[in-house]
Every structure is written in structure tokens, then in C-alpha cells.
Amino acid sequence: MGRNRSGCVARCVSLTALVLLLCCPVVRSSEAETDPDSHTEHGDSHGGSREGNDTGFQIVTFRWEHVQTPYVIALWILVASLGKIVFHLSEKVTSVVPESALLIVLGLILGGIVWAADHSASFTLTPTVFFFYLLPPIVLDAGYFMPNRHFFGNLGTILTYAVIGTVWNAATTGLSLYGVFLLGLMGDLKAGLLEFLLFGSLIAAVDPVAVLAVFEEVHVNEVLFIIVFGESLLNDAVTVVLYNVFNSFVEVGAGNVQGLDYFKGIVSFFVVSLGGTAVGIIFAFILSLVTRFTKHVRVIEPGFVFVISYLSYLTADMLSLSAILAITFCGICCQKYVKANLCEQSITTVRYAMKMLASGAETIIFMFLGISAVNPTIWTWNTAFILLTLVFISVYRVIGVVIQTWILNHYRVVQLEIIDQVVMSYGGLRGAVAFALVVLLDSNYVGERRLFVSTTIIVVYFTVIFQGLTIKPLVKWLKVKRSQHKEPLLNEKLHGRAFDHILSAIEDISGQIGHNYLRDKWTNFDRKYLSKIMMRKSAQISRDKILSVFRELNLKDAISYVSEGERKGSLAFIRSSSDVNVDFTGPRHSVVDSSVSAVLRESTSEVCLDMHAVENRAKSPKDREEIVTHHMLQQHLYKPRKRYRLNYSRHKLARSEGEKQDKEIFQRTMKKRLENFKPTKLGTNYTTKFRNMKKERAAKKKHSDAVPNGRLATHSVSFHVNKDSEVEDPADGGISFLITPASNDADETGTGIDNPSFSNEEDQSIYQMIPPWISNEETVIPSQRARLQIPRSPTNFRRLTPLQLSNRSIDAFLLADISDEHPLSFLPESSM
């Protein structure tokens, strides 16, 4: 195993070296393109050689400049992906070192190789590439898969940390650095108060990319994760406003700043944050409406999710609003309606494509953070400034978290403990957002731009590598509650919903408007108005809570039914419109025979619906002859070529055979279950029903064979199906099964299975039993009313209780009616 891994690593290293060798001519070619004189000379010499040696048409030519840019991009993506594969070959490494730290180290190595080969930093992470192409997929993935309940339940806490906490960190860091500078401990720097505040505003914000990369591997509990991650998303508005305000003040000059400008900065915060949120909500509404009408173009509907979400990001950035808030709330607000409108294939496509884009963008970001650092022209070292920056951002982060948490705990139901505060303080990671903002600074106005860039790179490396390495041992040492990735049980869902209703009722009665009250009002508003506008009608029905619970119980029924049948070795898993005989307990006498063939009713060693898989044992000579004939024909006859139906379509994806069978089984199951709901669903009038029963029984008495003692003859009831009969093919092209004639012998002991979901659970022998209080000598002729109401006795008392159609079903309890197909033989008729 070790040799295989070492060989794989060696191959990856050799491939990386090959990529770098291919990338080296890129810089030279780019330099040649930027230098017009050299390009002209090269063209002249090439033209002269062409004139001197005209060889005519060339079959193959090497045109590197033609494919240079896309080729290099594809190679870098390939290198980053291969590096990710190599990291995960060893679980010991990835369990200790975060993937983001490994990618930064890989970027440093590759950047060093490129610098040694070409002596120029030809590959760097530019702000344009980061903000327009790499950041949107990551934020969209975070918003689309956001746990809305936890997010909105802790929204007040998240906004407190995001707004007040970010302003606190930016102001205290900038003022503290400026105070130390005035003391003369940093040397001679070309910076004033506004420059230090500008640096504090860009270094204070918690980075969402870094938080996602580290905290997803730690697996802390949901509340702690959503608070830290929500803060990193929502502090973008504060970061953008502070950065733009102080950057404009620096460009204008400290002497030209007026008091009105500070007021405009405060107003711009609300405009940027609320405007970005509004843009995201509007585009989420548009996306939900568009996906409502994509029923006939299923193939392209996943594209609308990405295109419209990306347009929300670009629109907010065009209007100088918070683009991160726009695409975040676009994903949060549209996820419910989009998932309801899209088909299952499109939902899976969106899920995997979004995860792939986010993971790829995150990989490229951290790798290029390492590559960008290998550039001596951007480095300026100042030990005091760098070390004090690390100290101030860590100390003020702890102070801000402790003070804000102490205030918030007075209003929170679930308190944030000391352990949670330690993790929140330690989880203030900085990343590519700070690096991209500091690169955007203009060196003409900010004299210490190179020092700010160097310090930002050190801060990013320290928080991502050092804090990322130590946060997992810290969480284990503090015994922080971890998240449990499991689907909640149906019982937990029902109790949780009941508690929500109880809490909202308590808040309503007490007159207090809290989270539960607002959530209940929003749910009602969404159900009455929004869902009807942004969901198609079929999606509204399918998302009904009662039906969803019923579907889950049906799924559990089916799983237990199939698992029990496989354990018993039965093969009678046939869903048909006729009755199905399912009996896991063993052979018994059945009054009502099924329409399943005798061959299929035999027990076999595996579940198979083909005759040649049925074991040839305990069968009649005719059955054995049929099996032998089947084997002979299967093996020796000419097999014709299969004819495949053309399933290609530009607008639809053909469903597989398994999906068709699953759909057919579900439809037939629901058909049988819905038949049981007809009396209660359609509002059957039992008075009319009993009157019709009297008429039918009167007509039966005239045509029945009466015996001298006044009793009706007991008939053996069985269903007969013609030999050539078939179940109709379903509309969706599902499978069908041939039905062979049923046996007329009521004493036949079949080992098929009685499906409790389809067959009545009551004992059919009750119709043939004589009550113990009636002797053969004494026969009392009951009245007409007594004929409709059976006397209460231990034997038939269960007939008077509500009848549940399945011991694992949630079907409504129905009153047990007297079956018309089975006349009560123990009730004597009146003698004339």
C-alpha cells in the first residue's frame, strides 16, 4: 500500500513539473506580446524566412499563443485537483492538517518553482478574478444549503457579532496601531490616522471562505457553526462600507473631510446592507417564478439557478451594494421553492454542480494565496507592525466576543457557554477577502501599501495555518458539543413541530412577540400567498405535511416488508390491481385465493421473477415439465436481436427501468391504500349503505340454496382469471406480470406472502364459526335488526372495534362493516 501511494505521489510530482515547464513559456510569450518592437522584429524575421523558404501548406503547426490562456487555466485547475487527491490519500495527514493549509503550502512550493524558473511572478490572485469568478460560487453554495431554521433563529445574535463586532475590531485595531506609531515603536512610516483605520477595516472582518474551510472539518454543533459562519457572511456590508468610506477619505485627504461625510458613511451602511438584501430577495422571487414554468424544459432548468443567482451578485455590485449579501439571500430565499419546482434529476444536478464549483473555487483560492506570496516586490518587513497587528486582532476579538455574549445571554433562551465563546474567539479567521481588498489599494494615496500587503499575508497564513491546525485539538480538549449528521426520526419531527405550536401559542397568549410567534405567522403567510404564487400546484400538493408523513411511513412499511420477504426467501413481491396474498408466518388455508400463479407462490432461495430461477422441488409433473421446457427453449432457441427504443431527446432525460418500476409499485400501492380511504374521504352515508345492503341480501336469499334447517349453504369463494389475461400496462410504460389461473382448491397450502398493507387482517374463519351460545338443538331466529348487528361475544368482539387496515400503517380507523362477499353462515334464516 505504501509503495502504491509513493508511486502515485511521484507521478503527481512529475506531472506538476511538466505543467510548470509548459507554463514557463507563458511569461515569455506575454512579454513578447507586450513589447511591440520585439514583436515586429520577430514578425519581420519570420516573414523573411517564409519568403526565403516557402514550403507551401503545413499540415500540422504549433500555435501555443492561440490556446495559451484557456490551456494554462485548465492546467492550474488540474494541478489543484490533483493536489487535493494526493492530500486525501493519507487520512492521517488530513485529520491533523486542514486542507486549506495544505493548499497554501502547495501554492508556496509551486510559486517558488515558477519564480526559480522565470524570476517573475506571472501568476497571482487578482481582485477581479477573485471577486467576479471565485467568490460567488462559494457564497451561493453557502446560502443555498443554509439551514434556515438555525440561521433565522439566531439572526439577532449573528447581526450583533457581524455589525457591532466588526466595527469594534476595525476601530480598536486601527486606533491601537496608530497609538503605538505615535509612541515611535514602529519607526518612520508614511501613514496617518485614516491609513491605519483603513487597514483596520480590511483586516478586521472574518472571512467566510476560511471559516467554511476550517469549521466544516471540525464539525462543531449547529448553533456554534451558524453563528460564526453567519457572522462571516453578514459582516460583508460593514466591511464594504468601512473600506469605501476610509478609502475615499484617504483619497480626498484628511483636511478636506467634513462632518457631513461621516453622516453619509453611516447612511451608506444601511443602504448597502439593506439594498443588497433586497436585490437578493427580488432575484430569488424571479428565480422561483421561472422554475415554476420549466416543466417541459427539464434539461436546462438547473442553468437558471446559477445564471439568475450570479446576476443578483453582479447587479448588486453594479449598484455599489453588498454583492455577498445579495447572492446569499438569493440562495436562502429561493431554496424552498426551487427544490419544490425542480424534478429529482435537476435537484441532484444543482446540488453536485454547486458543490463542485464551490470546492474548486476554494481550492484555487488557497493555492493562489500561496503562489502570490512568492513575489519579492510586494514584501516590506516591519517586525513591530506585523507582530502588534497579530496581537491586537486576537485580543480585541476575545474582548468583543465576551462583552457581546454577556449582553446577548440576557435575551437568549439557549445560553452561549464559556467554551462556545472560546471557540468563537479562536475562530475569527482571515482569508482571501482581506488579501483582495489590500491589493486594491492605490500606492499613490497609501504610501505603506507594500507593508499592508505583507502584513495581510502574514495574518492570513497565521489564522489559516496555525489556528486551523490547533482548533481541532482545542475543540476536543474543551469537549465542545459536536454535530450529529443524522436524519431526525419521524417521532422527533412530530414532537418538534408540536413544541413549536405550543411555544407560539404561549407567546400569543402572553402577548409577547418572539421567534416562535414570528415563525408561525410567516409560515401561515407563506402557505396562503407565497407558495401559491411561486410553486406549481403539483408541488404544493406534494409538499403537504400530512402527505409527507404518510409517504415516510409508507417508505418504512416498504423497507420492512421487502427486508422481511428477502429473509423468508419469498418472491411474491408483485403489485397488481388484484388481491395479493402475503403471509410471512407460514402456510395457512386461505378462503380468498389470489391471482398469483402457483409457480410464483412457491418458496425459493432468492427473489426472482423468472421461471428458470425457481427450484424444481415439490411440484406437480406438469410444473416440472414446464420448467424443463422453459430451460430448453431458453438455451437452444435462436435469440433475436434486441430492439432498443430511441430515448434521446434534447429536452428530456429518459427514465431508467428501475425508476419506472419504482413508480409503478408506488402508484399501485397508493391505489390500494386510497381505496381504503373512500368511505371517510367521500363521506359515505351509512344509512343508505345499510339500506342497500338489505336490498342486496333480500335478492341473494331468493337465489340461494337453502337447507331444511333454515341455514344458508357455505360457499367456497375464489377468484378465477383466464389463462391469457394480463394486467394492463401502466401509462408510464412500467413492467407488467402475467397472471396464471388460480387454484380452485381452498385447502391448497401456498407459501406465498400475505401483504398486510393490501389484505384484510381479520380471520376469515370467523364467518364459518358457530357462536358458543347457540347449540345445534336450539336455533333462535333473529330479527331483521339483529341480522345487521352481530351479538357481542368473545368470538366476534373484535369485529365491533375499529379496524386498522395494517399493523404498520397510519390508515384511518374505519368501522368494520359486514362483508357482502362473505354471508354470515351462522345466522339462521327465518323459516316461512
From Swiss-Prot:
Signal peptide start-end: 1-29
Record's function text: Plasma membrane Na(+)/H(+) antiporter. Exchanges intracellular H(+) ions for extracellular Na(+) in 1:1 stoichiometry, playing a key role in salt and fluid absorption and pH homeostasis. Major apical Na(+)/H(+) exchanger in kidney and intestine playing an important role in renal and intestine Na(+) absorption and blood pressure regulation.
GO CC terms in record: apical plasma membrane; brush border membrane; early endosome membrane; plasma membrane; recycling endosome membrane
One GO term (biological process): regulation of intracellular pH
Transmembrane region(s): 67-89, 98-117, 127-144, 148-183, 197-218, 221-252, 260-294, 297-319, 322-338, 346-374, 383-404, 418-441, 449-482
Domain notes: The C-terminal intracellular domain is subject to extensive post-translational modifications and binding partner interactions which regulate transporter activity, scaffolding functions, downstream events and localization.
Activity regulation info: Seems to switch between active and inactive modes in response to various stimuli. Activated directly or indirectly by membrane phosphatidylinositol (PIs). Regulated by a variety of auxiliary proteins, which facilitate the maturation, cell surface expression and function of the transporter. Inhibited specifically by the drug tenapanor.
Cell compartments where the protein resides: Apical cell membrane; Cell membrane; Recycling endosome membrane; Early endosome membrane
Disulfide pairings: none
Protein name per Swiss-Prot or TrEMBL: Sodium/hydrogen exchanger 3
Region (Disordered), start-end ranges: 31-51, 740-760
Pfam families xrefs: Na_H_Exchanger (PF00999)
Gene Ontology MF annotations: identical protein binding; phosphatidylinositol binding; potassium:proton antiporter activity; sodium:proton antiporter activity
Main location: membrane
Catalyzed reaction equations: Na(+)(in) + H(+)(out) = Na(+)(out) + H(+)(in)
UniProt subunit comment: Homodimer.
Tissues where the protein occurs: Detected in early distal renal tubules in the kidney bundle zone, in proximal and late distal tubules in the kidney sinus zone, in absorptive epithelial cells of the intestine and in rectal epithelium (at protein level). Isoform 1 is expressed strongly in the gills, at intermediate levels in the kidney, spleen, rectum, spiral intestine and skin, and weakly in the brain, blood and rectal gland. Isoform 2 is expressed strongly in the kidney, rectum and spiral intestine, and weakly in muscles and the rectal gland.
Residues holding a 1,2-diacyl-sn-glycero-3-phospho-(1D-myo-inositol): G153, G156, T157, Q512, I513, H515
PANTHER family, sorted: SODIUM/HYDROGEN EXCHANGER, SODIUM_HYDROGEN EXCHANGER 3
Gene name linked to the record: slc9a3
Species per Swiss-Prot/TrEMBL record: Triakis scyllium
Topology feature Extracellular, residues: 30-66, 118-126, 184-196, 253-259, 320-321, 375-382, 442-448
Cytoplasmic side: 90-97, 145-147, 219-220, 295-296, 339-345, 405-417, 483-832
